């Protein structure tokens, strides 16, 4: 299989049971045969496993990287900033090209469409290629990308809408934040045995990513305080772990927390979430180590890029592997499998049969993944992977 040397040197098969199962299945069924697929998953070593499964299924693969070319503003106001500056590993981008797979930015993708060489399906991330017009629709990997598809005329499955994505965000992303801090010298939360007790963390956001960060920090022995929108109701996870919570609209209290923090990390998924004068002033006057774990700049323009680790990009992307493959395998498998489902629903089982218009039997715009498909991928991950016990703990089983 393509990329075998890199994959076999870096991973054991139990780290990617779901993608391995899809690759084996699709090598026989070839659901993507003669179809052009653009995949915009952030390009890192573990992403090669998703490419490999799709290629096994017969896909004519094109890899998309936002910002690769200039002139992105021509895509239109709604999509022009989607996924801007999405991190990638330049070395892996080179590997992809060396294996004969085209790598394009948004402008080149639009030019391909204009020249009659458009895409049958786009597996997107953070709405990077939402300005395109794939025949059978999109699959969006992240919650932050959904905003770019709210008025989309094509069907859009959102891989972040269900249970599978919790494996990546609750277990993998939080662990990636901790690893990144350790790589930068904050060894209190690495596997070195150092203790995080006494370090004060303020986590903005209590969704899947925020909860995952809190979980990892609690395991390290750190003191954690969460800032979130309390009008949304109580959070069972935070309540069960005795994590103190402050409402994001109580600006005096938030500013006080920031001033006393050793570390501040954002995980709200909202651009400019901390862009309040009182909070910005507290951040600029604080000694805290600032980091962002969202795709968007959650600090806003009032906080200089240089004041935040990794220049406001998601901190785990400084790592060779931002999220360990064992935690992201199920998400990438769902991303790809939802693509197969769109083709089936649009009448394209093999080749390019089916209607010229996008999947007429499906509504346009964002849709949740079917629970049956998620359960299938979850079963693969728990039965054949390395993290079954961690998933069971996360789910409270």
Positions of predicted regions on the chain:
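Glycine/serine-rich phosphate-binding loop and adjoining beta1-alpha1 elements at the start
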Residues: 1-32, 69-74, 81-88, 93-196
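A short, aliphatic-rich alpha-helical micro-motif
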Residues: 115-116, 196, 255-259, 283-284
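Adenosine-phosphate binding glycine-rich loop
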Residues: 3-19, 44, 158-191, 289-397
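Adenosine-nucleotide cofactor-binding segment
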Residues: 222-259, 264-271
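Glycine-rich adenosine-cofactor-binding loop
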Residues: 34-47, 189-218
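Histidine-anchored nucleotide/phosphate-binding helix
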Residues: 43-59
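ADP-ribose/adenylate-binding Rossmann-like module
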Residues: 124, 135-144, 263-271, 276-308
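NAD(P)-binding Rossmann-fold cofactor-contacting core
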Residues: 63-73, 85-92, 220-241
């Amino acid at each position: 299989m393509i990329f075998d040397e890199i994959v076999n040197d870096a991973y054991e098969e139990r780290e990617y049971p779901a993608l391995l199962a899809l690759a084996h299945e699709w090598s026989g069924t070839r659901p993507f045969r003669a179809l052009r697929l653009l995949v915009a998953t952030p390009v890192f070593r573990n992403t090669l496993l998703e490419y490999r499964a799709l290629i096994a299924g017969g896909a004519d693969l094109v890899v998309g990287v936002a910002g690769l070319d200039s002139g992105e503003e021509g895509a239109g106001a709604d999509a022009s900033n989607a996924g801007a500056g999405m991190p990638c590993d330049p070395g892996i981008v080179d590997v992809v090209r060396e294996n004969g797979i085209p790598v394009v930015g948004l402008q080149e993708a639009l030019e391909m469409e204009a020249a009659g060489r458009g895409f049958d399906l786009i597996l997107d991330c953070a709405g990077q290629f939402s300005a395109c017009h794939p025949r059978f629709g999109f699959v969006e990997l992240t919650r932050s990308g959904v905003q770019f598809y709210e008025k989309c005329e094509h069907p859009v499955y959102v891989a972040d809408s269900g249970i599978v994505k919790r494996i990546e965000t609750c277990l993998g992303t939080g662990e990636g934040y901790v690893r990144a801090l350790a790589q930068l010298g904050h060894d209190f939360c690495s596997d070195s045995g150092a203790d995080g007790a006494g370090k004060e963390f303020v986590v903005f956001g209590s969704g899947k990513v925020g909860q995952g960060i809190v979980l990892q920090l609690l395991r390290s022995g750190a003191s954690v305080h969460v800032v979130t929108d309390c009008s949304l109701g109580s959070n069972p996870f935070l309540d069960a772990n005795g994590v103190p919570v402050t409402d994001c609209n109580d600006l005096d209290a938030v500013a006080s927390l920031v001033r006393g923090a050793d570390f501040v990390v954002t995980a709200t998924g909202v651009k400019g979430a901390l862009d309040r004068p009182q909070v910005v002033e507290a951040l600029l006057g604080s000694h805290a180590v600032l980091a962002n774990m969202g795709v968007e700049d959650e600090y806003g323009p009032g906080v200089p890029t240089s004041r935040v680790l990794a220049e406001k990009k998601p901190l785990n992307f400084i790592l060779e592997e931002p999220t360990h493959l064992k935690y992201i395998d199920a998400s990438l498998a769902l991303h790809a499998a939802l693509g197969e489902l769109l083709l089936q629903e649009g009448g394209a089982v093999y080749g390019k049969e089916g209607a010229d218009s996008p999947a007429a039997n499906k509504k346009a715009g964002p849709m949740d993944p079917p629970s049956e498909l998620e359960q299938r991928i979850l079963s693969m991950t728990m039965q054949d992977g390395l993290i079954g016990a961690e998933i069971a703990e996360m789910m409270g089983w």
